From Swiss-Prot:
Name recorded for this polypeptide: ATP-dependent Clp protease adapter protein ClpS
Quaternary structure (record): Binds to the N-terminal domain of the chaperone ClpA.
PANTHER family, A to Z: ATP-DEPENDENT CLP PROTEASE ADAPTER PROTEIN CLPS (PTHR33473:SF19), ATP-DEPENDENT CLP PROTEASE ADAPTER PROTEIN CLPS1, CHLOROPLASTIC (PTHR33473)
Gene Ontology biological-process annotations: protein catabolic process; proteolysis
SUPFAM superfamilies: ClpS-like (SSF54736)
InterPro entries (UniProt xref): ClpS, ClpS_core, Ribosomal_bL12_C/ClpS-like
Functional note: Involved in the modulation of the specificity of the ClpAP-mediated ATP-dependent protein degradation.
Organism of origin: Streptomyces coelicolor (strain ATCC BAA-471 / A3(2) / M145)
Similarity comment: Belongs to the ClpS family.
Length: 96
C-alpha cells in the first residue's frame, strides 16, 4: 500500500520571514474628509504637508497607500494609532 504525501502545515501556511519589512496600509473609507486624513498623516507621522497630501490622494484615488514601514511591532503600533484616529488601516509584510 502506497501512502500519498499531503501538504504539511509549513506548505499551507505562509510563515512570516523575519528579515522582510512590514508596512502599514491606510485604506479609503467613505467617512473621513481628505483634509482630516492629511492632518493625521502630518500629526502622527510628522510628514510634510506635501507628502501627507500625496499619500492622502493615493488613498483617495487608488483606494490605499503605504504610509510607513518597519518591524512588525512598529507597524502594529502604527495601525492601532490609525484606528485611534478613525482610519481604516492594516499591516502586511512587504514582499516585493
Amino acid at each position: 500500500m502506497e501512502i500519498e504525501k499531503t501538504e504539511s502545515a509549513e506548505e499551507v501556511f505562509a510563515v512570516p520571514e523575519p528579515d522582510v519589512p512590514w508596512v502599514t496600509i491606510v485604506h479609503n473609507d467613505p467617512v473621513n474628509l481628505m483634509s482630516y486624513v492629511t492632518y493625521v498623516f502630518q500629526s502622527y507621522f510628522g510628514y510634510s504637508k506635501d507628502k501627507a497630501t500625496k499619500l492622502m490622494m493615493d488613498v483617495h484615488h487608488k483606494g490605499r497607500a503605504v504610509v510607513s514601514s518597519g518591524s512588525r511591532e512598529e507597524m502594529e503600533r502604527d495601525v492601532q494609532a490609525m484606528h485611534g484616529y478613525g482610519l481604516w488601516a492594516t499591516l502586511q509584510q512587504d514582499r516585493k
